[in-house]
Amino acid sequence: MPSTRNIETHNDSNPTLRALSLSALGIVYGDIGTSPLYTFKTVILLAGGGTPDVTTIMGSASLIIWTLIIIASVKYICFALRIDNDGEGGILALMSLLSLKLKQKPFIIAVGLMGAALIYGDGTITPAISVLSAVEGLEILSPSLKYYVLPIAITILITLFAIQSKGTATIGKAFGPVMAFWFLTIGILGAREVIQHPFVLAAINPVYGLNFLFSNGATGFFILCGVFLCVTGAEALYADLGHFGTAPIRCAWFGLAFPSLIFNYLGQAALVLEGASTEHNIFYMLCPSDFLLPLIILSTVATIIASQAIITGAFSMTRQAMQLGWLPRLRVTQTSSEGYGQIYIGVVNWLLMLATLGLIIGFGSSEKLAAAYGIAVSATMLCTSVLLFIALHKLWKWNIIKSGLVAGLFMIVDASFFAANLTKFINGGYIPITLAIIIYSMMYIWHKGYKTIAIKQKEKNITVDSFLDSIQKEGVVRVPKTAVFLTSKEQDIPPTLVWHVKKNHVLQDKVIILNINNLSIPWCKPGDQLQIVETGAGIWHAVANYGFMEQPHIPKLLKKLETQGYDINIKDITYYIGHETIFVRNVRHTLSKYIKILFVFMHRNALPMSNYFHLPPESVFEIGRQIEI
């Protein structure tokens, strides 16, 4: 289990803390760490481009610095990291925690799912804009190389997505040191300019940012779109909590990432104050010409690492959604035995690749991609702030005024950024929003469809006593074998068991009726994973408990019964599972009909139960049945 919540990391001399902090630099801070490649340039362009005046430069730098302080440092580092679901973070984990302990489930779930869906929308743009902005440095090296930027970026991304199925555990060990070198490099490049123009340090005063924001009318409002790009990776601070723990993430942020980012943004501001052209990438202009090519290579590697973190995060969130019952079963492949987070989901990988390549080809440059970037992640952050308010008030027991003052500040800032980013909707912002709506709809349809099936199954429930009476009256022959019947929690006796007895008139002398119970916590304690009770006549009711970060493996779990003294041979088990064919009856309401048809389509294309639960194919017996919805 990769969670490090039980590791003592409070002592700064602890080597574990240093190692985890280094790893966190590679996984957690890739996205936010590569934002200097395009953020300051975008802000200056939104402010009018050309040769900006001192007020514009200082105001832009001040807004970026204070956005990093309020959103990344205070909201996520100081508050969000302290609200975990058994050590796990992220909007789905927070949603599960609140819905488990509080009564406002529909609202909490709606906000959480929309936030999660929006992350997918953002995930398609991040690899595209990151890699493209890095490779665009070639244009500064030689203007004739601009024709190679797009092909190189496309090649890099295709290669990145293609190797996902092989796993990235080995090269992943280098992510931390590479990103540490990246942060040191961008910090030093920025510090060089700050030392030469110390006046730029005045931008740390928030008055510069506020004056610039409120004295420029609509322009000041639009500039927030560019400013927000500096924190687009902040949600990862929270989502990766379970992989590293609070202390390493904070140590990596305040120890290296945050000061390096501040110095780099101030350095870019100092460079423009000096009169540098804003037509080219300001970030690369910080670098001496002799070191430009190595910096371009380093930038490209850093953006690949940032993209890898987004892809891995998409896999992890998809698994969480499946386990929580919000997405259909998909094939999850463990690519490394060293880390549970090293997984691969083919459908997600290839859909992300197609969307990312489509964006690169469609927009053609990082400057144009910036028009589509930010709207989805700003909406996600607003959703997180809403859930944080509920957590502060209900879980921490803060009074509503205190909760409102803290979370209200975050919501005002997030809402301002979201409103500003909405102006990008027509210019490309509609793409991630549309994608988020599609994914949210899929989650809603899947959950609603399975809820409908569960209600129907409950209506046809057969009690254990009535089943035992029936097999006794009919004189069913018992054979010396073991059978496992998978069932839902709505049923005492699964239809597959009833059908088996009715058609074959025989029943194994040892029968386990197994219910898979997906919990709203990330990890189930080993001692609670399998609960079994004998109901009589050689029939046991068992419950297999799995957290939303765990991958069910039924044979491995049942093997525990052998070690606990049960007379069961795991190699002698026959697994009986239902193969449902869902069909839609005549429905007058068109919308309801199409929702059900979409559910049927998703159900038919879901991974078979036997594959998802890792059942041995030679020991599986599928029993078909039709269900009308």
Curated annotation (Swiss-Prot):
User: Cellular component per GO?
Assistant: plasma membrane
| Protein topology in the membrane | Multi-pass membrane protein
Annotated membrane-spanning segments are: 20-40, 54-74, 106-126, 143-163, 171-191, 212-232, 253-273, 291-311, 343-363, 372-392, 400-420, 425-445
The protein's location, in the record's own words, is: Cell inner membrane
Q: What Pfam families does this protein's entry cite?
A: K_trans (PF02705), K_trans_C (PF22776)
Query: The organism sits in which domain of life?
Result: Bacteria
Keywords of the record:
Cell inner membrane, Cell membrane, Ion transport, Membrane, Potassium, Potassium transport, Symport, Transmembrane, Transmembrane helix, Transport
Q: Does the keyword Membrane apply?
A: yes
GO MF, one annotated term: potassium ion transmembrane transporter activity
- Annotated catalysed reactions: K(+)(in) + H(+)(in) = K(+)(out) + H(+)(out)
Transmembrane in keyword set: yes
> InterPro entries, per this entry?
K+_transporter, K_trans_C, K_trans_N, Kup
- Family recorded in the similarity comment: Belongs to the HAK/KUP transporter (TC 2.A.72) family.
What does this chain do?
Answer: Transport of potassium into the cell. Likely operates as a K(+):H(+) symporter.
Question: What name does this protein carry?
Answer: Probable potassium transport system protein Kup 3
What species does this protein belong to? Legionella pneumophila (strain Corby)
| Top-level taxonomy | Bacteria, Pseudomonadati, Pseudomonadota, Gammaproteobacteria, Legionellales
Protein's gene: kup3
